[in-house]
Amino acid sequence: KIMELLIFVSKITNRIFYIFELILKDELGINFKFTTDKDKFLSHEGPKLHYGDHPLENNEGLYQQSVNLLFERDITDPNVKICKHNDSKAIFPVFNEKSLFCFDIFSASFYIISRYEEYLPHVCDHYNRFQPQDSILYKMDMIEKPIINIWAKELGEIIKSKYPDIQLKKKSFKFIPTYDIDAAWSYRNKGFFRTTAAFFRDILKLDKKEIKRRFDVLTNKKMDPFDTFDYQIELQKELKIKPLYFILCGDYNTNDKNISIKNKEFQELIKHLGDYALVGIHPSFSSYLKKDVIKEEIKRLSEVLNREITISRQHFLRLCLPTSYQILSELDITDDYTMGYASQAGFRAGYADTFPFFDLENDTKTKLNIHPFALMDGTMKDYLDLDVHESFDKAKKLIDEVKNVNGTFILLWHNETLSGEKRWEGWITLYRKILDYALK
């Protein structure tokens, strides 16, 4: 018989059900059931845990003191306090010495993973994005740690030491490379007007090198520098990795400079990538919060590939909770890969694994799966201003963190980074080193 953990709570809310399921079942593999019957709980012989604001007399089982957060439905500002925990930090301190942890591990995890703080008033950056420095993890200096996985592991060890018969899940580390295709080519397939305009721009700038480079590519003397797709497929075969691709299919504008989806060569490329990998939509900058625009972009990609599109990642990582996720769900997207920051490496939701999106506005667990990424090429280059050596150290540190908790490490890269040209000099070798390190 599989051991079950009986959990006593004064009431079962959607928030409670969601976070206990995530930590106990998904992360630790522990089966459990809830009861609100105190006597049933006290007389229960097997493994048991009480979660509530004060301990019960005669409880032989485990006790975790609670704060109010999970018993509520409304989105109020809980005025989060940071406290010490072992050699690091936590939030939502509790003070009863019988409590398993000196903080409410379930409320703390829920607050972070639900992105509660992103529903509260905050100042966005110039692309309408929530800023990492406003997050509690940043203030705790824990943004580069998969903190929920770490806490869950500690909880698992405590439960196991009290109830040795409980089986914990054996998780294994996974590595998923992903590519955002914002512009498949640097010079080719840009159409007559864009190409002519670019030539005139180079002439005005007297940029002889660039004029020659463009001319050589357009006359097929040289490969287009952004055309690194053969190399990606080679890596895929050699290292037996399964990447994901997100394709920008929006209308051309300042922030969406993709190749037109009507272009035949672009369509061929998309089909070619689709033969080797799972391909998803990269909703454009200008589709932000516009359901009909995203719907049209999904339709364009779906028609090229002749299959349903179920995975997505926002261009510029523009994400507004819960609206962005509500829209994607309504458009039959099942899995989103946007969760992460542009300006900061690490774990936006404190978790290095897939989790279901909990919609705080409607107080429900949804069917949309969130896949957080830990590292993006542009973050290191443009925001943190790291060279290739520092970038490798950053990647190594994050991969080690995820390996430590047997989580999933998702890497976000772009085809142009693998050109190894101009600003991306040395980045092909860096990419290969990161892959080798993750896979060893």
Where do the language-model regions lie?
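Generic enzyme active-site microenvironment
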Residues: 178, 280, 313
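Catalytic domains of cell-wall/extracellular-matrix polysaccharide-remodeling enzymes
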Residues: 16, 286-365, 422-424
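Short acidic/histidine-rich active-site segments
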Residues: 280-282, 338-341, 412-416
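Anion (oxyanion) recognition and catalysis
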Residues: 237, 273-274, 329, 403
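Residues within well-ordered alpha-helices
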Residues: 232, 268-269, 324, 398
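Conserved hydrophobic/aromatic pocket- or pore-lining residues that grip, position, or stack substrates
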Residues: 180, 282, 328
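Terminal accessory/targeting
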Residues: 1-261, 353, 360, 364-440
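Acidic, glycine-rich loop-and-beta core segments that form the ion-binding/anion-interacting portion
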Residues: 233, 239-309
